[in-house]
């Protein structure tokens, strides 16, 4: 049933998500007339666009004569597409209310059935991935000299996965995965220097950074953050951030304040891999990855930072860098690329594994990099026509994705209209569960951890008169300067 109330076996009453959707979004506050002035689009235009989207999606389907089988075993003779494509990333998501705005757009896509169909928005391999049970962040417990039990970044399933102490204070310096930023999936690197300067949530002795130029990038206050690195504690005379180690290829604001600078190479002078484990370059037609090989020999005293990290790990005899007899495992990053395994059979590169014919998974191959070079430094796996669409529920695709190591099991990936993880955070704020937010964050968590998308004015509008300056500017870096900022731009 899509609507109505159901009594569960345990006696509790429950309603389908669509009942909750209708109960919220049919309220007068969501009517076109209620939002027209706010968004600057007349109500009649909003209704016209909505009608056009619905007409195209449901009355003008894009149909491919391609049979496929879903995860329930049902065979479909055609692929029915809803030719409405919606995209949201930088722009909408750059605003402080963008999280829920993007969620609203994704909900619209799900209601239209315009997810990975002919003519609609499509997944790029190795996605989609099931969430949950994506691995949660690790770091609640740790021991010096031993590796973390998993990745420091991950996907919290609820308050139980937050990296907080018993009293609710953050365990990470950047406060990611705390009650202040429970869904900080990429970490909050822009808060690293301000938090280290403030000693909040704790003081640190060393800040060690690579390439980010955090004195300028993402700080929104270059002068203020630069002063933080030079400021001393009047009580002790010591710097508030005692030691800063930084590696970069060029001079920058952060280099100027570093105690130790490790000169890096440019991307033209080192080995790199564009990995399925990091930021993959796959397409809707299949997974892909690539390498960079050095084409210039450095003419100065520099070393690739990846090589430096491997050397440090080896000299410190850290697990994963030395064998049981104390000998080094990797000579350099070049060897690491083909030799390292995240888990048995899975490494940084997916192509030419094992005997050189393996795709996705396979034993490390000493000739892997040579095979990439012979293939113009790229590897790509082409999906079949049957696997090309409905990847979250396409039996053939999910079996292939499992075989390639992109997912753990060939099971349907359920798309959540109602976010269960957000519901758990809201319930905690309402007093349920063992892990509770601090009282000062309880109201905020209850409001914003809404399992259904909401809209609210950008937070900065509360700090100034929005009517006096109603425009919101979003800056965008050119691709060539994506990892080179401010004073570094002169070098490009």
Spans of features found by a protein language model:
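Acidic/polar loop patches that form or flank catalytic/metal-binding clefts of enzymes
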Residues: 44-47, 60-62, 85, 114-124, ...
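A cross-kingdom feature strongest in bacterial/archaeal respiratory oxidoreductases
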Residues: 102, 111-116, 131-135, 165-298, ...
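Conserved structured core elements
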Residues: 11, 15, 26-29, 43-50, ...
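Charge-patterned, long linear interaction tracts outside catalytic cores
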Residues: 3-21, 31, 318-352, 356-358
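Hydrophobic alpha-helical scaffolding
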Residues: 7, 11, 21, 25, ...
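Long, well-ordered, tryptophan-enriched scaffold segments
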Residues: 1-74, 78-79
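A glycine-rich, hydrophobic/aromatic-adjacent loop/helix-cap motif
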Residues: 33, 49-201, 272
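Flexible glycine/proline-enriched surface loops and loop-helix/loop-strand junctions
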Residues: 2, 14-18, 28-34, 87-92, ...
């Amino acid at each position: 049933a899509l609507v109505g109330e159901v009594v569960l076996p345990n006696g509790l009453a429950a309603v389908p998500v669509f009942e909750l959707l209708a109960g919220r979004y049919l309220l007068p506050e969501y009517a076109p007339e209620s939002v027209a002035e706010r968004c600057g689009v007349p109500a009649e235009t909003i209704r016209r666009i909505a009608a056009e989207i619905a007409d195209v999606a449901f009355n003008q389907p894009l149909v491919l004569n391609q049979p496929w089988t879903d995860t329930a075993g049902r065979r479909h003779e055609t692929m029915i597409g809803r030719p409405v494509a919606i995209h949201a990333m930088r722009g909408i998501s750059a605003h402080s209310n963008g999280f829920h705005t993007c969620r609203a757009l994704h909900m619209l896509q799900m209601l239209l059935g315009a997810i990975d169909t002919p003519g609609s928005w499509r997944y790029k391999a190795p996605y989609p991935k099931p969430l949950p049970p994506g691995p949660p962040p690790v770091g609640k417990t740790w021991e010096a000299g031993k590796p973390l039990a998993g990745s420091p970044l991950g996907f919290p399933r609820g308050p139980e996965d937050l990296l907080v102490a018993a009293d609710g204070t953050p365990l990470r310096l950047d406060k990611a995965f705390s009650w202040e930023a429970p869904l900080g999936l990429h970490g909050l690197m822009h808060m690293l220097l301000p938090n280290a300067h403030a000693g909040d949530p704790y003081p640190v002795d060393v800040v060690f950074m690579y390439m980010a130029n955090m004195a300028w990038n993402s700080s929104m206050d270059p002068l203020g953050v630069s002063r933080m690195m030079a400021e001393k504690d009047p009580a002790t005379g010591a710097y508030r951030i005692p030691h800063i180690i930084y590696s970069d290829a060029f001079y920058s604001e952060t280099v100027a304040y570093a105690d130790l600078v490790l000169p890096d190479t440019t991307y033209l002078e080192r080995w790199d891999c564009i990995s399925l484990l990091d930021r993959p370059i796959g397409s809707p037609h299949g997974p892909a990855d690539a390498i960079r090989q050095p084409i210039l020999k450095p003419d100065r005293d520099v070393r690739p930072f990846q090589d430096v990290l491997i050397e440090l790990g080896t000299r410190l005899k850290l697990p994963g860098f030395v064998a049981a007899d104390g000998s080094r495992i990797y000579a350099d990053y070049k060897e690491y690329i083909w030799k390292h395994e995240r888990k048995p059979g899975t490494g940084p590169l997916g192509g030419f594994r094992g005997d050189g014919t393996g795709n996705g998974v396979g034993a490390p191959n000493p000739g892997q990099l040579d095979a990439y070079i012979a293939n113009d430094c790229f590897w790509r796996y082409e999906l079949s026509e049957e696997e090309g669409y409905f990847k979250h529920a396409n039996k053939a695709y999910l079996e292939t994705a499992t075989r390639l190591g992109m997912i753990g099991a060939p099971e349907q990936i359920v798309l959540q209209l109602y976010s269960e993880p957000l519901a758990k955070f809201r319930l905690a704020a309402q007093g349920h569960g063992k892990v509770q937010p601090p009282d000062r964050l309880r109201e905020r968590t209850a409001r914003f951890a809404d399992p259904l998308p909401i809209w609210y004015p950008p937070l900065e509008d509360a700090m100034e008169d929005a009517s006096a300056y109603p425009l919101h500017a979003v800056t965008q870096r050119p691709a060539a300067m994506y990892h080179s900022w401010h004073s570094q731009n002169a070098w490009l």
